[in-house]
């Protein structure tokens, strides 16, 4: 019997950015349909608008009002259509409440489809946080990003962000907050929670005996308290508690040398304490900037939300407003995110 292909809901992201373009480019790869059944969620007019820009005017868009209507045929992009964009007010590369709300609503719809069991996984294109909150804050709402939206709409309290580039994986104790606040969030219970989430993610990816590394917060991992005490008071106790639960974990380790070992295959996942501690090493190996084209190329990283009752993966880059509408955006991160979603969905 042929293996069942998962249905993956792909949100369009902020339509003023690169999401619609890279979605078309990704789904132009016919082999994607060998692995998944892709369903785009958003305003179909935005996908139609970029077919030529993306270099694929031969492709077509099928608007559907239910998952059951989708046929998942290469060359035709199934879009769960939501009437979100006024074409007279739309402009590429501009922050707007209209596009921010469109991106937000497409994410919420994808979550609803996954929670209802109508799709097997979700995969998100980038949204612009300023645009989204420009739309939401007048209503008394605010979200820092995708992860917080997913946590709210799935009722999840224990979650974390994982970034992956091939065999390098990092999972964060904190992400979108000021660095001063990030230091305050380094607490034993949270560090232990993230160690466990990272270990579980590796198991779901088929790694039988995950090796987990934990970075220190301070220079030289605190140098035995000389440069800070968080390693002694919070991080080390969390590591000991994780070991007591049978997790193979090492640390706290100095982050300036840790990633060389991780890239060499010594560890399966690295727990980092704050946003840039994990994003910098992963994006250093996952991003390439083409100076001549003045554009990012070969963007291979993937963002995964851990701890949710549904699968959510994402591109590991922003909306690319400076490239929007020019046909120069790279779809590789989205292709990898779709594949990651399929891998995680197959384990559920």
Question: Language-model features: where?
Answer:
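Contiguous, glycine/small-aliphatic-enriched amphipathic segments in soluble metabolic enzymes
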Residues: 1-144, 189-213, 217-273, 277-303, ...
């Amino acid at each position: 019997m042929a293996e069942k292909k998962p249905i993956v809901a792909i949100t369009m992201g902020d339509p003023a950015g690169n999401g619609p373009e890279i979605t078309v480019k990704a789904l132009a790869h016919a082999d994607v349909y060998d692995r998944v059944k892709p369903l785009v969620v958003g305003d179909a007019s935005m996908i139609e608008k970029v077919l030529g820009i993306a270099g694929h005017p031969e492709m077509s868009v099928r608007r559907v009002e239910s998952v059951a209507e989708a046929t998942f045929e290469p060359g035709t992009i199934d879009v769960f259509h939501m009437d979100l964009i006024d074409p007279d007010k739309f402009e590429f590369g501009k922050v707007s409440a209209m596009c921010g709300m469109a991106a937000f609503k497409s994410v919420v719809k994808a979550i609803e489809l996954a929670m209802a069991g109508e799709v097997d996984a979700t995969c998100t294109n980038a949204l612009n946080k300023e645009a989204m909150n420009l739309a939401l804050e007048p209503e008394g709402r605010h979200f820092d990003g995708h992860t917080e939206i997913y946590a709210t709409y799935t009722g999840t309290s224990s979650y974390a962000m994982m970034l992956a580039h091939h065999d390098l994986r990092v999972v964060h104790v904190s992400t979108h907050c000021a660095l001063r606040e990030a230091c305050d969030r380094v607490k034993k219970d949270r560090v232990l929670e993230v160690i466990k989430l990272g270990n579980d993610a590796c198991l779901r990816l088929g790694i039988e005996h995950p090796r987990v590394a934990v970075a220190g917060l301070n220079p030289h991992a605190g140098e035995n308290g000389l440069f800070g005490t968080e390693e002694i008071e919070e991080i080390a106790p969390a590591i000991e508690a994780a070991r007591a639960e049978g997790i193979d974990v090492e640390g706290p380790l100095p982050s300036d040398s840790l990633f060389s070992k991780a890239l060499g295959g010594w560890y399966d996942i690295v727990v980092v304490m704050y946003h840039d501690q994990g994003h910098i090493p992963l994006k250093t190996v996952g991003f390439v900037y083409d100076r001549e084209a003045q554009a990012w190329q070969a963007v291979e990283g993937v963002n995964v939300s851990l701890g949710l009752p549904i699968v959510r993966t994402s591109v590991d880059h922003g909306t690319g407003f400076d490239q929007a509408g020019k046909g120069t955006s790279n779809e590789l991160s989205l292709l990898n995110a779709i594949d990651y979603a399929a891998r995680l969905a197959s384990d559920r």
